[in-house]
Amino acid sequence: MVEDDSEGDLCGHGTACASIIRSIAPECRLSSVRVLGAGFTGSGPALLEGLRWAVAKGYDVINLSLSTTKRDFAVVLHELADSAYFQRTMLIASAHNMPVESYPWRFASVLSVGSHQQDALDYFYNPTPPVEFFARGVDVEVGWLDGGRIRSTGNSLATPHMAGICALVLAKHPELTPFQLKSLLYLTASNVRGRR
């Protein structure tokens, strides 16, 4: 499934995520794959085809600020995530904003991200099962459609923060595998228990 992308971002979500990545890793090369339509609607086949295309391109980092609750797509998403992992592509996916079973963030081959806020009552935290990393995702100023700026909240906005960090690390250490990159991030994350 390939669509003409001359319309660009139809809902602002991709623009917001790209603006966060660019703010953290300004020298990185960004590519966009549209899998969401107007009104944040999307389809499983579009998600699978977009991810399949991105994995085949061999990008160093793939940001997936989305998830699906459709179990029908879990097996193929898992295969694509594993394929990315073994070809040394770091796939970074946001946890669902609600405590529901969703994919692909739950797979071990994916770096999973939730939003972090100092408030203990953070609504967007997904405690069961816990995500691997938390990044800023609450009241974040982001780029928007037509060159605008808005403030928004969600795990989708935390995920590109981690993607930007991964891009910076890989720019300095391109030899790192996804496993090594995850390990490095664990050792340096301020929200990991036992950090010195």
What residue ranges belong to the model's regions?
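An often Trp-containing, charged/polar helix-loop segment at the C-terminal end
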Residues: E175-R196
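Predominant activation on well-ordered alpha-helical scaffold segments within soluble catalytic domains
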Residues: A18, L48, A163-A167, K182
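Subtilisin-like peptidase catalytic core
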Residues: E3-T69, L187-V192
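Mature extracellular/periplasmic domains of secretome proteins
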Residues: G42-N63, A74-T89, P99-S112, D122-F134
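A cross-domain feature marking catalytic cores of carbohydrate-active enzymes
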Residues: L66, A93-A95
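Extracellular S/T/G-rich loop segment that most often corresponds to the catalytic His/Ser-adjacent loop
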Residues: V100-A171, E175, F179
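Structural detector of well-ordered beta-strand residues that form the stable sheet scaffold
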Residues: S31, M90-I92
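Gly/Ser-rich catalytic serine loop of serine hydrolases
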Residues: E3-T15, H96, I150-M162
